[in-house]
């Protein structure tokens, strides 16, 4: 990416010039669906998913190279005792991913999904958002650019996930800054915060948003001031996927916060995205509703790691398989609707 003016300038340009869906591929998918051996609409959302795949890939619905991308980052705000786990767990879980021992590894095996994990300077936590910006504009833009590389190896379905102790606090701050209400509306237990710890978490979100209140009219400023490296990288990955016409499945509360930044910058920025699941984190459903989306799954999960998006990838693969593999009425010798 070229450097022109301020670090965010290139991203602002990209967000203004997003490609739209492929109307011809969408029409072809609808035409084929009408000929398949089933009543119209009988596959419900599977049909809509197939149409979504066609519209954004520009071809018949297919998922041949699905990929889960996990972005890991650490946060200075954890020093306020807002989470029961130490920041060292982020690095330990990255190592667990590499060893194949995490839940996401098992889901990827079960659904034949690729997996990439991006370690985002874990030894250098972001700034404490209650006292300063999480990132400089230059660092935030560089991390977005790094996130865009998630698709470099090729994929036709990108599942976005994260790992980062303290990042549900970050997600809550972003949602509070974007949508208002109260900090308590957006803060949940995360990895298990309760009692006094939960109150400290709420207080941290309140203090952070108040500190940066003069800069909340710009979504990219919200991201750099209240976000984190995994937030910036996920936003970059989602943006890169749009440019390359790759459909995206977004995971939980934290990944949705990254997506919300893009939506605030351009209302059409998430048209190529579906929400994989609604997590048990209380603010997630509210955040999804603010995006105008409907999650594919509701399993009471709150793990992160891209697990909900990865499970939803199995549904997307099934939708594509039904669309491409089912016989038409003519092929099967089945009578159509009179």
UniProtKB/Swiss-Prot annotation:
Query: What is the top-level taxon of the source organism?
Result: Bacteria
The molecular function terms in GO held by this entry are: nicotinate-nucleotide-dimethylbenzimidazole phosphoribosyltransferase activity
Which InterPro entries does the entry mention? Nict_dMeBzImd_PRibTrfase (IPR003200), Nict_dMeBzImd_PRibTrfase_bact (IPR017846), Nict_dMeBzImd_PRibTrfase_N (IPR023195), Nict_dMeBzImd_PRibTrfase_sf (IPR036087)
Q: Which Gene3D superfamilies match?
A: 1.10.1610.10, 3.40.50.10210
Q: Is DNA repair among the key words of this record?
A: no
- Active site annotation, chain numbering: 305
Cysteine pairs forming cystine bridges in this chain are none
- Entry-linked CDD domains: DMB-PRT_CobT (cd02439)
Q: What is its EC number?
A: 2.4.2.21
Q: One GO BP annotation here?
A: cobalamin biosynthetic process
This protein's pathway: Nucleoside biosynthesis; alpha-ribazole biosynthesis; alpha-ribazole from 5,6-dimethylbenzimidazole: step 1/2
Write out the entry's keywords from A to Z.
Cobalamin biosynthesis, Glycosyltransferase, Transferase
Q: What class of enzyme is it?
A: transferase
Q: Which reaction does it catalyse?
A: 5,6-dimethylbenzimidazole + nicotinate beta-D-ribonucleotide = alpha-ribazole 5'-phosphate + nicotinate + H(+)
**So what family is this one in?**
Belongs to the CobT family.
Q: What does this protein do?
A: Catalyzes the synthesis of alpha-ribazole-5'-phosphate from nicotinate mononucleotide (NAMN) and 5,6-dimethylbenzimidazole (DMB).
Q: Which NCBIfam families match?
A: cobT_DBIPRT (TIGR03160), PRK00105.1 (NF000996)
Record-given protein name:
Nicotinate-nucleotide--dimethylbenzimidazole phosphoribosyltransferase
